[in-house]
Amino acid sequence: MGDFEEYKRQGEPDQQKKAENWGIAIGLQKVDDLTPSKYLISVAKDNIEGRISVDEVAEQIARYYKKNPAQTPQEHNEKEADEVSARIAKLLSTHTFSFSPAEYISIHKSLFSGILDVEIAGKIRTYDIIKEETVLNGDTVIYGRAKCWIMISGLKKSFLIKG
């Protein structure tokens, strides 16, 4: 579902890039065992084909769930997958990135604001985590230690203030 292979093989260069972005965005949902809705696949195709912008995808997703509120656990999971996929696709289309704590925090906030608790989205965690990943057959991703993120963030702030 949603791999957009026909666009990757036969599409124009812009379509190929958009299809790749959507494939990544949707594929990343599998880490949390989430599957996007058929509606997202449809509007993603509209974006790939140039009928709507990536911003309009997010707007249409928001309108869709306002009109059709998620009620079952599966619908809530689809809603989360749809919203985060649209945000990832937008992020991938920006062509900018810097490997820094500020960028990490900004990405996390833009992906999860309104989805995760306000205390979590865009915040550096203060505790270490291990999370069994379905896509890894129950193994965990090696997450960075919270203490390191806090230290790096503090050093960066200190450098910016003094520098």
Task: Enumerate the predicted regions with their spans.
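FIC/Doc superfamily catalytic core
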Residues: 1-163
